[in-house]
Every structure is written in structure tokens, then in C-alpha cells.
UniProtKB/Swiss-Prot annotation:
InterPro entries tied to this protein: 2-oxoA_DH_lipoyl-BS, Biotin_lipoyl, GCV_H, GCV_H/Fam206, GCV_H_sub, Single_hybrid_motif
Cofactor note: Binds 1 lipoyl cofactor covalently.
Cofactor(s) this protein requires: (R)-lipoate
Lipoyl-binding domain boundaries: 17-99
Residues making up the signal peptide according to the UniProt record: none
Organism annotation: Rhizobium etli (strain ATCC 51251 / DSM 11541 / JCM 21823 / NBRC 15573 / CFN 42)
Subunit-structure text: The glycine cleavage system is composed of four proteins: P, T, L and H.
Protein name: Glycine cleavage system H protein
Keywords attached to this entry: Lipoyl
Top-rank taxon, per record: Bacteria
Keyword Iron listed: no
Amino acid sequence: MLKFTEEHEWLKIEGDVATVGITNYAVDQLGDLVFVELPEVGATFSKNGNAATVESVKAASDVYCPLDGEITEVNPAIVADPSLVNSDPQGAGWFFKLKLANPADADGLLDEAAYKELTA
């Protein structure tokens, strides 16, 4: 199941784990990324907590945790090469995996149609 937030994060949810990254729209707004800081594995976040930071040639921006949960994995490839986020934001450019405290909370996020409407 693919979900989106109004803060331009995407979530690919499989069971009680969500892979999280930033959307194509966010990447377009930021420009070329030059730095990514990810959370620690095992860290817990509340919804909308500041989980990661990205810096681009234009600005620095926070990446928010879309739902309550615990970080189970991070993507070290994007720390070594932030351009992966630019080239494949919803694939190889994922940020972290989040074990959801309450998977049903994902129902309150945007579906693809609603997100496209938000960014139109």
C-alpha cells in the first residue's frame, strides 16, 4: 500500500513496516541534494517528529516521521551518495524503514490521487 503525507513523504507499507522517503515533488522543490542525515536504528519517533535532514543547493529541510514507530533500518547508500534521492526518490532513494506502532493509523494518510491533487 502506497501512502503520502502533506509534508511530501511517501510510505510503502507492507504489514506493520513502512519504507519511507521523500516524493518526486519534494525533490523537484529542493533541487540537487548534497547531504542527508538519517536517524539511528532503534530510535522511536512520534508522528511528525523530525526524523531526518536533507540539504540541497537551495535549502536545508527536515524529513518528518509520518507515523508513530521505531526505525528498523536506514539506507546508508543515500548518505554516501545523496544524488540517489534525486535520481530515484521512490526507489533506491528511500530513507528509512519504520515499524509502525499502530498500522491502522496509515488509513489517515493521503492516497496517490489525493496527493496528486495536493501538489497540482
